[in-house]
Curated annotation (Swiss-Prot):
Domain of life where this protein originates: Bacteria
PROSITE patterns from the UniProt entry: AP_NUCLEASE_F2_2, AP_NUCLEASE_F2_3, AP_NUCLEASE_F2_4
Positions contributing to Zn(2+) 3 binding: H182, D229, H231
Keywords of the record: DNA damage, DNA repair, Endonuclease, Hydrolase, Metal-binding, Nuclease, Zinc
Gene Ontology terms for molecular function: deoxyribonuclease IV (phage-T4-induced) activity; DNA binding; DNA-(apurinic or apyrimidinic site) endonuclease activity; phosphoric diester hydrolase activity; zinc ion binding
Catalysed reactions, as listed in the record: Endonucleolytic cleavage to 5'-phosphooligonucleotide end-products
Species whose genome carries this gene: Cronobacter sakazakii (strain ATCC BAA-894) (Enterobacter sakazakii)
Gene Ontology annotations of biological process type: base-excision repair
CC cofactor note: Binds 3 Zn(2+) ions.
Similarity field: Belongs to the AP endonuclease 2 family.
Record's protein name: Probable endonuclease 4
Function, as annotated: Endonuclease IV plays a role in DNA repair. It cleaves phosphodiester bonds at apurinic or apyrimidinic (AP) sites, generating a 3'-hydroxyl group and a 5'-terminal sugar phosphate.
Length: 285
């Protein structure tokens, strides 16, 4: 079964997110459990936690259908000790919030060396950060997202993801999320079925499908191998419809959240309906 949805707003409180997902016909969703552009957030109260869990039950969302995302401020590979500690503390808090809400996944961007560390040293620092956070929390898997490779961001090569996983001690609590726009911008072609098969065979060889915990389904305004992160609506960018149809028909992508972060929330319901139709080969674009 495919779990298909979008990154919905948690404005007004996390308990509002499940209903917003249900309104667009989603069978999965992503959210921020706090303001993603602030370091601090009010603690989750028992009432808020209960409301969120009740809303998930009401709308039929289990933990495996929900892919929370951490704050954009966090850099688990930061070269400066003070900033690194701040990021690590924030990441631990994000994992703890997910656990409180009964969630089992937390999607994060690996980190940036800021031109002050080698790639290898930064990847090791990221893995160390993950180990520290997993040691201080329970029940939530840290899900590394591939990046487009803008600036000094790491995670744009499958080898980066594998290097982090290799150094994480508890392999049962680490996974990856593949963003199609990021992969395309990083030089992994997806424009034809043959491209998809080649790219994901490479992913399986280097990382392994056993670590795939989620997907971000985004077309790209950015050009191939540009290392620029610019999302677009499905079929309107430089990737096209083909990979999204292909993903819907492959069992490797069953039972994980498949999340839209496309640029027009007004058509998310249409994009979700189109994706659902591709599972049986219907609704050609």
């Amino acid at each position: 079964m495919k779990f298909i949805g979008a990154h919905v707003s948690a404005s007004g409180g996390v308990a509002n997110a499940p209903a917003r997902a249900a309104e667009i016909g989603a069978t999965a969703f992503a959210l921020f459990t706090k303001n993603q552009r602030q370091w601090r957030a009010a603690a989750l109260t028992p009432a808020v936690i209960d409301e969120f869990k009740a809303a998930c039950r009401k709308h039929g969302y289990g933990p495996g259908q929900i892919l929370p995302h951490d704050s954009f401020l966090i850099n688990l590979g930061h070269p400066e000790p003070e900033a690194l500690e701040k990021s690590r503390a924030a990441f631990i808090d994000e994992l703890a919030r997910c656990a409180q809400l009964g969630l089992t996944l937390l999607n994060f961007h690996p980190g940036s060396h800021l031109q002050q560390l080698s790639e290898e040293a930064c990847l090791s620092r990221i893995a160390e950060s993950v180990n520290i956070a997993l040691d201080k929390t329970e029940g939530v898997t840290a899900v590394i997202e591939n990046t487009a490779g803008q600036g000094s961001n790491l995670g744009f090569r499958f080898e980066h993801l594998a290097a982090i996983i290799d150094q994480v001690e508890d392999k049962s609590r680490v996974g990856v999320c593949i963003d199609t726009c990021h992969a395309f911008a990083a030089g992994y072609d997806l424009r034809t079925e043959e491209d998809c098969e080649k790219t994901f065979a490479e992913f399986d060889r280097i990382v392994g499908f056993q670590y795939l915990r989620g997907m971000h389904l985004n077309d790209a305004k950015s050009t191939f191998a540009s290392r620029v992160d610019r999302h677009h609506s499905l079929g309107e960018g430089n990737i096209g419809f083909t990979p999204f149809r292909w993903i819907m028909q492959q069992s490797h992508f069953d039972n994980i959240p498949l999340i839209l972060e496309t640029i027009n929330p007004d058509i998310w319901n249409e994009e979700i309906a189109w994706l659902k139709a591709q599972q049986t080969g219907g609704a050609q674009a």
